[in-house]
Amino acid sequence: MERAEFERMHAVEDRMWWYRGLRALTAQLLARALAGSPAAGPVLDAGCGTGGMLLKLGPAVAGRSTVGLEYDALAAALAATKAGRPVAAGSVNEMPLGSGTLGGYLSLDVLCHGGVEPARALKEAHRCLGPGAIAVFNLPAYDWLLSAHDRRVHNVRRFTGGQVRTLLAGHGFRVLRSSYWNTLLFPLMLLHRLVGRADAESDVRDYPRWLDALFSAALAIERAAIAIGIGLPFGGSLIVVAARDG
């Protein structure tokens, strides 16, 4: 990832609408899934970036401890400081963790990264999770939506729901829930991609307060729909809750 993009993320992820929406949706789905999981052990934020999610995980993990893993040493240090939690520097392709030690695993916009081998990362996640443990994956949707932010964070792939379900099933995971999100704003996203330049500025930035509030409200509506079991049929992102089989 470009260093400047890490710095942007660190600066705005506590207040930007997209990050707040992702954290709220992840916490909602994770809390519900963990409540029905037999697996104990800490919850790992694998590829935790600069720590925005790790900071907010506490209420969602049902008394479990939380830890982070981040490949970039600077981001790992920023995450540890921001979240006040242990953060190891390492790769999701080969995690420095014992087998069966985790009760939960978060992978938020990680399998899309050019430095990550999805099959290898999922094999490692399966190894480190206990039987029945919960994994939550968030991924950018649709290859044709690659953006300036994708390029700056070295994302090289985006996914469809079918691709993710097949990938997870092939590596020992049972999908419990899946939904696209960022659906109501999808027409704006599509328009932005169609008219934007390849060298456009990053999507990660502060937005005018009124616009941030409007976008946040759209995500809150989607979150309420997902909470009652409605799977959204398309969107800019895809979130999947799975359990480790075996």
Regions found by a protein language model. Give the residues of each.
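A short glycine-rich, Lys/Arg-flanked "PGG" loop and its adjoining helix->strand segment in the class I
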Residues: 119-134
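Short, glycine-/aromatic-enriched active-site segment of Class I SAM-dependent methyltransferases
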Residues: 10, 135-157, 163-166, 192
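Conserved N-terminal segment of class I S-adenosyl-L-methionine
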Residues: 1-98, 104-108, 120-122, 235-238
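A C-terminal cap/extension of S-adenosyl-L-methionine-dependent methyltransferases
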Residues: 185-246
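Conserved S-adenosyl-L-methionine
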Residues: 173-183
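Short catalytic micro-motifs in class I SAM-dependent methyltransferases
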Residues: 109-113
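Feature marks short, surface-exposed loop/turn motifs that line or immediately flank catalytic pockets
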Residues: 75, 143-145, 184
